[in-house]
Amino acid sequence: MNIHEYQAKAIFADNGILTLKGKVAFSVDEAVSNAKELGGSVWAVKAQIHAGGRGLGGGVKIAKNLDEVKDYASKILGMNLVTHQTGPEGKLVQKLYIESGANIVKEYYLAILFNRMAEQITIIASSEGGMDIEKVAKESPGKIAKVGIDPQIGFKMFHGLEVARVLGLDKDEGKKLISMIAKLYKLYMDKDMNMLEINPLIKTAEGDFYALDAKCSFDDSALYRHPEIAELRDITEENPAEREAAEFGLSYVKLDGDVACMVNGAGLAMATMDIINYSGAKPANFLDVGGGASPETVAKAFEIILRDKNVKVIFINIFGGIVRCDRIANGILEATKNVEVNIPIVVRLDGTNAAEAKTILDNSNLKNIKAATNLKNGAELVKSLVG
């Protein structure tokens, strides 16, 4: 689960992590009122959406007087903000964060995340803050520190010293940053986060470190332990189809392609998407129907993916282990009773009750179903149908 910048900063402040003063606004008048209340002569007017790249998309502006606060707020509030993380459809800006300015001497990048391959918590830090960290990693890898932490040991001084060394901090600056990272690490662990990112982390003229931005992502499976975090969920920021799918036990993520995928198992779903890409087509979604799929959930999956007007072909790839292939076949028939399907369906069914499933589909009057003999053949069929 993701939360907004202003919510993340409130959590930071409650845990002793320095942030600039700021207030959320839901209208232009409230934005101006907040700026007056905060005082000063410089304010940041920030769009609050669950996506990065807001600045490049025009969603973050620096105002040097109240008239500019009003002007920027009126332009940003209600805009459809498109960034590299929103996709071409963008996100509607429904709230702003008005934040006091700061005397910035240097910008850094700092993140804490879980490295599944190494089975460690990893701190990523860079002296190049406020930039795309992937670009920095590609062009200047020496400017990035990657420090692995064994969760059984936790964050120690030597971890922080390595970060401070790569960032080029002096002794006093290093002490301040290490203290901040220790608090962030504890917060990351205590709140069951998947990712914590500050970009940029700033150093002021006074030598203090502040989180100028804040992104926090939490483990959905652990939210029952943190009702105070669960209350921060903003469902207006979530894809309606993804939210509906979750209510039916389906794992669905919308993508930008034109080949809809319906698969059982996350690993097979990823492999299916890979081979679709390899064939030259583009997947329109990730969709895992899970091991307990019923005809009803399969029908719901059909209903959801067919709402995507970009979809030209549906690729159903099922390996019957826990889920039986005949259930999937019956689900396909159930779906076509309630939803008109005018696009081709490529089906690859293997495993438990695959023969029965084939019989069910063969005996149906569905004329737009094509059977695939294997995964590669399925991808080739999909590509030929997409064109």
UniProtKB/Swiss-Prot annotation:
Residues holding substrate: 264, 321-323
Instruction: Provide the family line.
Output: Belongs to the succinate/malate CoA ligase beta subunit family.
Q: Which cofactor does it need?
A: Mg(2+)
User: Which residues participate in Mg(2+) binding?
Assistant: 199, 213
Q: Where does ATP bind?
A: 46, 53-55, 99, 102, 107
Keyword Metal-binding belongs to the record: yes
Question: Pathway of this protein?
Answer: Carbohydrate metabolism; tricarboxylic acid cycle; succinate from succinyl-CoA (ligase route): step 1/1
What keywords are assigned to this protein? ATP-binding, Ligase, Magnesium, Metal-binding, Nucleotide-binding, Tricarboxylic acid cycle
Tell me the function of this protein: Succinyl-CoA synthetase functions in the citric acid cycle (TCA), coupling the hydrolysis of succinyl-CoA to the synthesis of either ATP or GTP and thus represents the only step of substrate-level phosphorylation in the TCA. The beta subunit provides nucleotide specificity of the enzyme and binds the substrate succinate, while the binding sites for coenzyme A and phosphate are found in the alpha subunit.
- Identify which top EC class this enzyme belongs to: ligase
Catalysed transformations (reactions) = succinate + ATP + CoA = succinyl-CoA + ADP + phosphate; GTP + succinate + CoA = succinyl-CoA + GDP + phosphate
Name of protein: Succinate--CoA ligase [ADP-forming] subunit beta
Whom does it interact with, and what assembly results? Heterotetramer of two alpha and two beta subunits.
Give the EC number.
6.2.1.5
Q: Sorted alphabetically, which PROSITE patterns does this protein's record hold? A: SUCCINYL_COA_LIG_3
According to the record, cofactor stoichiometry and binding are noted as: Binds 1 Mg(2+) ion per subunit.
List, alphabetically, the InterPro entries matched: ATP-grasp_succ-CoA_synth-type, ATP_grasp_subdomain_1, Succ-CoA_synthase_bsu_CS, SUCC_ACL_C, Succ_CoA_ligase-like_bsu, Succinyl-CoA_synth-like
Molecular function terms in GO for this entry? Answer: ATP binding; magnesium ion binding; succinate-CoA ligase (ADP-forming) activity; succinate-CoA ligase (GDP-forming) activity
Q: Name one GO biological process term.
A: succinyl-CoA metabolic process
Lineage of the species this protein comes from: Bacteria, Pseudomonadati, Campylobacterota, Epsilonproteobacteria, Campylobacterales
| Any matching Pfam family | Ligase_CoA
Q: Which HAMAP family has this protein been placed in?
A: Succ_CoA_beta
Record keyword ATP-binding present:
yes
Which cellular component terms (GO) are annotated to the entry?
cytosol; succinate-CoA ligase complex
